[in-house]
Amino acid sequence: MQQSESKQLVSLLDELRGAVEELLLAGLTTASKSTIERMDVSFKEASRMKLLRLGSTLRIANEEISRFTTGSTQFSSRRLAFFLGRAWLLATSMRGAVDANDTETLDRLMSTPPTQAVQSLKVVALGVAKRVVPGAFAAFDFRLRATEASSPVEAGEAMIWSCVFPMRKDLDLPAEAFLHLPQKQKFKPSLLLEKKIVEVTRCAIHRQSPSATRLVLGDASEMKTADEFDDWRPLWRWDPRAAAARLEQHRPTPLDLEIELQEEVFVDRWEAGERKSTDQGYDLLPISGGHLEFEARLDRGPSGTPLDAIMTRLAEKKRKPPLYGVVHYESCKLVLQPLTALGKDGPEYLTVSPDKISQAALVKAMKFT
């Protein structure tokens, strides 16, 4: 890390620790507006500096702060306390590693593996995860597959590309609308949902076991659609034994979260159990398939639109389509996040609404986002 980067990191860590301590000492009800704004700035700065672990922690903490300030019934004091504490612990540990010039520990805490350049890459999108906090942000994780080998990427390799959009409180716009806004590389993320081969040039990847390979774009990167893709079925497979082996070998640390160990799964034949409501802002839908028992969590807020309604409809069908999604392990349960229904004509993306987007609202978002 260069000296200028080290100074920026130290400044961010000190600012973050101070904001968390002020927030905990004053409490949310009496915390100053500037303290809450400092938390938001810290999240954006951590994302800009590609501090994956710290950025994701701050994102969730800010999500709970936003829920509290808006009076949302989904607010969880337990989640807020956990992620504020985790953010402080990460910031303190990283500052200690910087002071001790311990690059190995710092790299592990930053969770930023080295990148590898890729000149050209062809992918298709199997699904997309969506997380929305009104008045704060909308985040999308596109689950991709490489359609052919392109060193160092292997054919069929699982990949992720993520994008996060700030959301203003006064903007009445569905989260999907932001996918139609051009990125600084001049492409619109919505092209990934066209069920076509997408060609990405002058990009990079980084690998960090056991996560999927992450696609990284730079200022010179380009993304454009190519040919139609209809060879979906060979991509619809997973190996439970390999997943079990990865789980057996996994050694979590106190800083790891359950969702950091995820598996992409395909559930061919499945049945739904009795739906149950929780006070955590989501409903539980038991799903049995492939000799395994899953627990699907359906968000009752904007993150679950339109997934909640679609899964309710699919659960009532006699002939149910195969499902694709991601699973993490929590309290000895397989927690499923359904992303896609698999049909004869390819994937049906369950998490993004097909409704038309107001062009006038889009123009307004482009001016102020």
Name every feature range the model reports, one short phrase each:
Residues 1-369:
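Helix-loop junction hotspots and adjacent acidic micro-motifs that serve as functional foci
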